[in-house]
């Protein structure tokens, strides 16, 4: 498989108080936030519109399970179904089933240290249609 990961889709982390931490990042680092955190919009080397999501989660979230780590990374991929098939053949632990939404497909794996990694195959036309970059 030629292209596996095409970019960083997001960085998610646990915190005691997501609203308070978003306010801190807004006040001290100038990151405007919304209910999910913040989406950084950018263009790749070919001029395609892209995004990276930064999101604090409540410390008791189960979204990172079965990992017990304080963070989870999301990587953008081109062909999630094929990639998960290849990763499974390589012995990588796959978590759950592929989930599909109007903005993309998602799958999850564990790295050797138990970090849950989210893989995202975005659907750009739906997710980016109102963004003027």
Regions found by a protein language model. Name each.
Residues 52-55, 108, 118:
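Conserved beta-strand in the GNAT
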Residues 42-47, 109-112, 122:
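Active-site beta-strand termini and strand-to-loop segments that position acidic
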Residues 1-22, 70-75, 123-133:
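N-terminal beta-strand motif that seeds the catalytic metal site of vicinal oxygen chelate
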Residues 2-6, 12-55, 89:
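Core segments of cupin and vicinal oxygen chelate
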